[in-house]
Amino acid sequence: MNLTPKEIVKFLDDYVIGQKKAKKIIAIALRNRYRRMQLSPELQDDIVPKNILMIGSTGVGKTEIARRLAKMMGFPFIKIEASKYTEVGFVGRDVESMVRDLANAALNLVKNEQREKNKDKIDEFIENKILEKLLPPLPKGISDEKQEEYKNSLEKMRTKLRNGNLDESTIEIEISQNMFDTNPNLPPEMGAMQDIVKVIGVGSKKVKKEMKIKDAKNALKNEAGEKILDQESIKSEALKRAENEGIIFIDEIDKIAVSSGNSNRQDPSKEGVQRDLLPIVEGSNVQTKIGTLKTDHILFIAAGAFHLSKPSDLIPELQGRFPLRVELDSLDDKALYEILTRPKNSLLKQYSQLLKTENLELEFNDEAIKEIAKIASRANEEMQDIGARRLHTVIEKLLEDLSFEADEYAGKKFVVDKKMVEEKLGDIIENKDLARYIL
């Protein structure tokens, strides 16, 4: 999607309140990708993305900014936590697995696009498979009259199938089942093993299953995709997208920083993770299920609160690979008020719509919203600052009884005012010990 930095920021304003500096830097970084793709291939190789380090406490919008943009622009995007990785040689996930995760995200993205583009062909394939089971084909040598009768019956059955009249009927279908897919406890790294067994033909088998037609439609989607879509071109496009448009969001980067004033036995392992991360961020080749992926032009966005450490505690080489730094603002009561009122699908709108399903019309007057924002802001100041996430806790506590007794208010309108907010939350916020457990 070809958007100018101003248009990108305008889009983000609908979802993330404030944080103008962060929005501006990310908008420029994404626009530079578009600019790079307009250059000659030789020059494209020399221009590397300027990776970003976002500094700010939890709940201020670091992840949301990156996630919203990636989704809007159709970029492969993954969010990982730096603290979940271990140094090579230790038990746990190694840093290369984040690149493999990005490859999978790109593959799923392209597959979904192709499925949508070829929806009619896929639906026709599934339809024909089900109709074969409902009305098996006639043997050869049948009279023209019988063939005409069969054709008419088939069209009637097709109409019923399309209208959903047969959804509850049961049929037996044959589907491919991979033995690795049936075990959810296997680690993601088993993806490489899955590719190997596919090649040698082990681990996948056809199984017959009885199911309702509406379930059979979903079960046959993968098989239809495998048969109709060009898998090699999908992999090729996914590899290209991951290399040139991929975004890896590394959260909790501060957790692997070695604080100069706090050395402990885990520090060597933390520094080891940083050193393992360095070649990935600098640019290297990683083997994935879609081919060898070059990380040279992936955009890395690292983020952390840096309460117990500071960016300078990262190893110098890694610091140099994140040249763009932006500090995000903490959210005061005014910002929290805007978060409750401005976004398209604001928190208050979400709660109102949820209770609307119970035929209850819920409204918040302006004074109540301001009081909610004040209480959330005060809780953040007096306890740990968790940003906008505090609003979830505050509103849940405020509406707890109403949600429980919603059926009693069916067909009525319920207005939340300042008095109700003070009654429900006032005593809790005044009692600090109690507030720590409830808010």
UniProtKB/Swiss-Prot annotation:
Q: Which SUPFAM superfamilies match?
A: P-loop containing nucleoside triphosphate hydrolases (SSF52540)
- Entry binding sites for ATP: I17, G59, V60, G61, K62, T63, E64, D251, E317, R389
Q: Which InterPro entries match?
A: AAA+_ATPase, ATP-dep_Clp_protease_ClpX, ATPase_AAA_core, Clp_ATPase_C, HslU, P-loop_NTPase
Q: Which GO terms describe its biological process?
A: protein unfolding; proteolysis involved in protein catabolic process
Keywords, A to Z, come to: ATP-binding, Chaperone, Cytoplasm, Nucleotide-binding
Q: What is its main location?
A: cytoplasm
Q: Which domain of life is it from?
A: Bacteria
**Is the RNA-binding keyword given for this protein?**
no
Subcellular location field: Cytoplasm
Key word Nucleotide-binding present: yes
Q: Which GO terms describe its molecular function?
A: ATP binding; ATP hydrolysis activity; peptidase activity; proteasome-activating activity
Q: Which Pfam families match?
A: AAA, AAA_2, ClpB_D2-small
What are the record's GO terms for cellular component? Answer: HslUV protease complex
* Family the UniProt entry places it in: Belongs to the ClpX chaperone family. HslU subfamily.
User: Partners and quaternary state?
Assistant: A double ring-shaped homohexamer of HslV is capped on each side by a ring-shaped HslU homohexamer. The assembly of the HslU/HslV complex is dependent on binding of ATP.
General function of this protein: ATPase subunit of a proteasome-like degradation complex; this subunit has chaperone activity. The binding of ATP and its subsequent hydrolysis by HslU are essential for unfolding of protein substrates subsequently hydrolyzed by HslV. HslU recognizes the N-terminal part of its protein substrates and unfolds these before they are guided to HslV for hydrolysis.
Q: What is this protein called?
A: ATP-dependent protease ATPase subunit HslU
Origin organism is: Campylobacter jejuni (strain RM1221)
